[in-house]
Swiss-Prot record:
One of its GO terms (molecular function) is metal ion binding. Induction: Negatively regulated by lin-41 which causes degradation of the mRNA encoding this protein. Residues 186-201 have a biased composition (Low complexity). Residues 102-115, 169-180 have a biased composition (Basic and acidic residues). Belongs to the DMRT family. Residues 19-68, 117-164 bind DNA. Residues 90-100 have a biased composition (Polar residues). This is Doublesex- and mab-3-related transcription factor dmd-3. The gene is dmd-3. The keyword Chaperone does not apply. It comes from Caenorhabditis elegans.
């Protein structure tokens, strides 16, 4: 019996994994045949150090298993050990992009991932992780392999937090870029006022220049002849003359 028959969920679909170092710096490069050409191969930032540390822990697990059994790690144990790392990468990739890199879709629904308990895996026992934490027989195990598993899980949790933070930052950046476009498409209050007041000015009664000059001249002449005379409101007089303007039909 081969590994495909033992764990068909690991080989049921072709998955595409991306370089974790490049993801730390906002790039998406396929992991296959990428190691030697990776731009961040020797990067020593805190995020890339987490990636390297997790790889060291995986190597440490293999060394412990090989030294105890005095034989290479079994295929089953290797698959269970590597599955957690692959599942974490699937989770981090799906958190970073909307494209599903670690899960296939069937009828528009994402395929459910079913991770195994890594503590049990180190003791050659297969148990599904969901609802298993409190009932795990190796919950309080302090063997070297379980201690490495605990440290690796902490690193993986930190990396998932990093991917989620990167996703939030990317979404915020996209929102800031879309905001000016939406604002430019929204009519401003000034334009609205101009649009609403323009018809009013066009429909208002046009002022007759001849009648206005006559009213002003009449008022000036009357003030010269009798300065003590009390005049009514000039605007009322002007509006009365304009309303009876004989030049409207000209």
């Amino acid at each position: 019996m081969n590994i495909e028959e033992i764990l068909p969920e690991l080989f049921g679909e072709k998955r595409v994994y991306y370089c974790q170092r490049c993801l730390n710096h906002g790039l998406r490069e396929k992991r296959k045949n990428h190691k030697l050409s990776c731009t961040f191969r020797f990067c020593q930032c805190s995020n890339c150090i987490m990636v390297e540390r997790r790889r060291q822990l995986n190597s440490r697990l293999m060394q412990i298993d090989g030294s105890r059994d005095e034989k290479p790690m079994t295929t089953l144990t290797m698959a269970l050990t590597c599955s957690e790392e692959d599942q974490m990468e699937c989770t981090s990739q799906s958190e970073t992009t909307n494209e599903s890199s670690g899960e296939d879709k069937d009828d528009g629904k994402p395929k459910e991932r079913r991770p195994n308990c890594q503590r049990c895996a180190q003791h050659s026992v297969v148990n599904r992780l969901k609802g298993h934490k409190r009932a795990c027989p190796f919950r309080d195990c302090f063997c070297a392999k379980c201690q490495v598993v605990v440290e690796r899980q902490k690193l993986m949790a930190d990396q998932i937090k990093l991917r989620r933070r990167q996703k939030r930052e990317k979404n915020n950046l996209n929102s800031e870029r879309e905001a000016p476009i939406a604002h430019s498409m929204t009519p401003s209050p000034i334009d609205t006022v101009t649009t609403t007041t323009t018809p009013t000015s066009e429909t208002s009664t046009p002022m007759c220049l001849k009648c206005a000059q006559q009213v002003i001249g009449y008022q000036q002449l009357l003030s010269l002849l009798d300065p003590s005379a009390t005049l009514q409101d000039p605007m009322i007089t002007l509006s009365a003359v304009l309303s009876a303007c004989p030049h409207k039909n000209e």
